[in-house]
């Protein structure tokens, strides 16, 4: 399938990405788990004219149902995960739209074309002195893209050697 636009309109959720954060206290267990699933704008378009915190009970129930579906699917890989959840937070494309001002809540920024990757490659440096960019639309999109472009932006400020020295592992 075309992985760049792949989405199955299945109920319940049929695909997730599970990310477990490395514990800072040396514990072999994580305290934080992120679960991500694709969601097209059409799923939340009915609330597009609303604001954060003012979307009503139907929207809250929709988010709760999607969170429950994600956790249930994650439990096929992490048994009893739901029983271990102390707090949970969910977002939709509306959340991304309202907090990041991305069109229709895009979480991945400018669409990249693997046939011609240089066409959408942006650099951190701008023509405006001391104005630098970072984020999902510069080089790589998504969660990893934001992390990588932050390093590119830091390299513009500190120099590549300084960033390499900071990120180098023994």
Protein language model features and the residues they cover:
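A glycine-rich dinucleotide-binding beta-alpha-beta segment and adjacent secondary-structure elements
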Residues: 76-140
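Active-site-proximal substrate-binding core of FAD-dependent oxidoreductases
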Residues: 159-170
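Mid-domain catalytic core of redox enzymes
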Residues: 1-28
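Short acidic/His/Gly/Ser-rich catalytic and metal-binding motifs that mark active-site loops
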Residues: 42-49
